[in-house]
Regions:
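A short, hydrophobic C-terminal helix/tail in secreted or cell-surface proteins
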Residues: 321-326
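C-terminal non-catalytic regions of proteins with extracellular/luminal or membrane-system context
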Residues: 1-320
């Protein structure tokens, strides 16, 4: 097994199937699917900052699905591709490395390496494309992308942890036109998922995370049943953000610098390694021993999806036992 095969196998073994009702997954051979979301053309493959990686050899989710026999609705996917190209032409990615020297001298490394990377806007397809796609298939696949979450302070509440207004509009449009909807979560961190149970059309939910360069190909194989999802959650997904005990201590938000907490805010003395920094954000783990699932278990907080949760395509049938002569 070469490196690419190993990377692909790692993805297939770690993707978590959170929901699968009505047998919407795996997709049958030659399935017709309406694809939604900008991430179908630009899947989030890695974190950012020091965790960033760009192989440059990954297919899009669209092309990966075609390679395993799935038939995406061409007009809709072509429209998304045009919209995405136009967005990046008008919003080129820029990073001014000349600022690093000044940042080092001032002790404000946080200002450079905690940079927030906003998600591209979620585009709303024209009504005629929605109508055309819904006449062609009853199944929709929405790839929900999140580019943030790879470095200390680059998460936001609005348009990040929660769906953006554009995503909410798209969600309603998808569910109004397609009775079978599968959603793939493609991003660095967790997000609010209360909207999943509020829409009965969403029959399948996959947590892809950031899968690396073999992610699109591995995802396609999982969606058509060439591989069986076998990943389990390494975290707890809460029903609401306030159920996380550390939520109120999360303060690394450069949009609101006055809310950033330091050692002094907790009555602590900075260690020597941090005293050279003019402003070093800190989060205190006040949960003590009740980190992660221990908090939910100990205090009876029911999660949306518990630590270790993960479904598969396998169906087991149990019948009543009966004695049999040896």
């Amino acid at each position: 097994m070469n490196a690419r095969e190993t990377a692909r196998q790692a993805v297939k073994s770690s993707v978590v199937l959170l929901k699968n009702e009505g047998g919407v997954l795996p997709l049958p051979q030659g399935a017709k699917v309406a694809l939604f979301g900008w991430a179908q053309w630009d899947a989030v493959l890695s974190g950012n900052g020091s965790g960033a990686a760009r192989g440059g050899v990954s297919p899009s989710v669209v092309d990966a699905l075609k390679a395993v026999g799935v038939r995406p609705e061409e007009s809709l996917s072509a429209w998304y591709q045009d919209e995405f190209k136009a967005y990046h032409k008008d919003n080129p990615s820029e990073f001014d490395f000349t600022k690093i020297k000044d940042a080092v001298n001032s002790g404000l490394m946080y200002e450079i390496f905690g940079k927030y990377i906003p998600n591209p806007p979620e585009f709303s397809p024209p009504q005629e494309l929605l109508d055309e796609a819904s006449r062609w298939t009853d199944t929709a696949l929405w790839i929900v992308g999140r580019k943030s979450g790879g470095e200390e302070c680059d998460r936001r509440l609005e348009n990040d942890y929660y769906l953006s207004n554009q995503e909410k509009v798209l969600l309603e449009a998808i569910c109004a036109h397609f009775p079978k909807v599968a959603v793939v979560l493609n991003g660095n961190g967790l997000m609010d998922l209360s909207w999943v149970e509020e829409h009965s059309q969403i029959q399948a939910l996959l947590f892809l995370g950031v899968p690396g360069e073999e992610g699109p190909a591995a995802l396609a194989e999982l969606l058509v049943g060439k591989a069986n999802p076998s990943g389990k959650l390494s975290v707890t997904i809460a029903k609401r953000r306030n159920d996380y005990p550390a939520w109120e201590d999360f303060s690394w938000d450069k949009d609101h610098p006055k809310q950033i907490k330091t050692y002094e805010d907790y009555g602590l003395t900075p260690p020597l390694v941090d005293r050279a920094f003019a402003h070093r954000p800190v989060t205190a783990y006040r949960e003590d021993i009740y980190l992660g699932y221990r908090y939910f278990d100990s205090f009876g907080i029911e999660p949306l999806y518990p630590f270790g949760f993960g479904l598969s395509y396998t169906c087991l049938l149990y019948t009543s036992p009966s004695p049999r002569d040896p």
